[in-house]
C-alpha cells in the first residue's frame, strides 16, 4: 500500500487511518474479558516504532492473549507497514469494560 501511494506523482500529502480494537473477546465464554497487559505490549511496539514483534504474532497467539477481537490489530500492522521510518505516540488508552474492549488512540508519523 505504501509503495503504491509513494509511486503516484500526484500523491502529495496522504493520511492513512487504521481502526480496530485491542484485546476483546466477542461471542465466546470469555466475552467481557480485556487484557491490558497485552494491550500495553502492542502499544509499546507502536511507541518504539518496532513492527517486527507484531508481524511475528501468530493467529493463535493473538487469539490467546488478545481474543478473537484482538485480530483487529492486523489493520494497525498494515498501516504501520505502509509508513517507513514511522514514529508512534499513544495519545490515550483505556480498558473500557462497558465496551468490552481495550481502546487506544495512537498517532503515527514519518
Label every PLM stretch briefly:
Residues 1-4, 18-19:
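Short, hydrophobic/aromatic alpha-helical segments in well-folded domains
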Residues 3-10, 29-110:
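Flexible, D/E/H-enriched segments
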Residues 12-22:
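Beta-strand elements within well-structured catalytic alpha/beta cores of enzymes
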Residues 24-28:
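Short acidic/glycine-rich loop or secondary-structure boundary segments that cap or lie
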Amino acid at each position: 500500500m505504501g509503495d503504491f501511494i509513494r509511486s503516484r506523482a500526484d500523491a502529495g500529502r496522504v493520511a492513512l487511518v487504521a481502526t480496530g480494537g485491542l484485546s476483546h473477546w466477542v461471542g465466546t465464554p470469555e466475552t467481557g474479558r480485556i487484557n491490558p497487559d497485552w494491550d500495553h505490549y502492542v502499544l509499546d511496539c507502536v511507541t518504539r516504532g518496532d513492527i517486527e514483534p507484531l508481524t511475528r504474532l501468530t493467529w493463535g497467539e493473538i487469539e490467546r492473549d488478545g481474543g478473537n477481537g484482538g485480530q483487529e490489530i492486523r489493520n494497525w500492522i498494515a498501516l504501520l507497514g505502509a509508513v517507513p521510518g514511522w514514529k508512534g505516540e499513544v495519545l490515550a488508552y483505556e480498558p473500557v469494560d462497558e465496551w468490552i474492549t481495550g481502546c487506544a488512540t495512537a498517532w503515527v508519523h514519518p
